[in-house]
C-alpha cells in the first residue's frame, strides 16, 4: 500500500516552467501548500543545455534578481547569423535578421544553473521540492477528476518486479478538488 501526502498543488517537473509556477503560487499566497517533484537526482540535473534567455520572465518573478545572485551573468554582446556552405560561409547582415533572432538585452545562460537557482528560491518560499521522484501515474477520483499523482516505485528489478529493497511510490493527493 502506498503512503499518501496531501497538497494544495502538485507540480511535476523541476524545469523552468514548473519552478516558475511553484514560485509564483507561493508569491501570490504564502499559505498555499505546494509540492514539486523532479525525476533528476537534483534540480537541474536533467537540463544540460545552454540557452539565450530573455530576462523578462525572471524579472517578473524577482525584480531584484541581479541583487539576489541569479546566474544570468553573460549579456549578449552582438548578433550574428552565419550560413555554412560547401566552400565556406556567408554572414547575413544583422539588419536582415528577423526580430526573433535579435538578442539585445538577453543573456547567455546555463539552463541547469538557472533551474538550480530557481529551486533554491522556491524552497526559500516554502515549496516542498522532492528531487529523485518521477511522476508515474495520474490519479483520478470516481468522477474522473484528477485527484493527484503517484510517484514511481523504487527498488524494482530489471524485469520491473519488486526487489529486496522495494518501496512503493507515494501518492501526492490534492486537498481541494
Label for each model-derived stretch:
Residues 9-33:
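N-terminal Rossmann-like FAD-binding beta1-loop-alpha1 element of flavoenzymes
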Residues 26-47:
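Glycine-rich FAD pyrophosphate-binding loop
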Residues 40-87:
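N-terminal FAD cofactor-binding segment of flavoenzymes
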Residues 100, 151-173:
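A structured beta-alpha segment of the ubiquitous adenosine-cofactor-binding alpha/beta core
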Residues 101-120:
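Short beta-strand to alpha-helix junction loop
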Residues 132-145:
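A conserved short coil-to-beta-strand element within the FAD-binding core of flavoproteins
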Residues 175-177:
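Conserved small/polar residues in nucleotide/adenosyl-binding loops
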Amino acid at each position: 500500500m502506498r503512503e499518501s501526502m496531501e497538497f494544495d498543488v502538485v507540480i511535476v517537473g523541476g524545469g523552468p516552467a514548473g519552478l516558475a509556477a511553484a514560485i509564483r503560487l507561493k508569491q501570490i499566497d504564502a499559505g498555499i501548500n505546494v509540492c514539486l517533484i523532479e525525476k533528476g537526482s537534483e534540480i537541474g540535473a536533467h537540463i544540460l543545455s545552454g540557452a539565450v534567455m530573455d530576462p523578462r520572465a525572471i524579472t517578473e518573478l524577482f525584480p531584484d534578481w541581479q541583487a539576489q545572485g541569479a546566474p544570468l551573468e553573460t549579456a549578449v554582446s552582438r548578433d550574428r547569423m552565419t550560413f555554412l556552405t560547401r566552400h565556406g560561409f556567408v554572414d547575413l547582415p544583422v539588419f536582415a535578421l528577423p526580430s526573433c533572432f535579435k538578442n539585445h538585452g538577453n543573456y547567455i545562460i546555463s539552463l541547469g544553473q538557472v533551474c538550480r537557482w530557481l529551486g533554491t528560491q522556491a524552497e526559500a518560499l516554502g515549496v516542498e521540492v522532492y528531487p529523485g521522484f518521477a511522476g508515474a501515474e495520474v490519479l483520478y477520483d470516481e468522477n474522473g477528476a484528477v485527484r493527484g499523482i503517484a510517484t514511481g516505485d523504487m527498488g524494482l528489478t530489471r524485469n520491473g518486479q519488486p526487489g529486496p529493497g522495494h518501496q512503493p511510490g507515494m501518492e501526492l493527493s490534492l486537498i481541494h478538488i
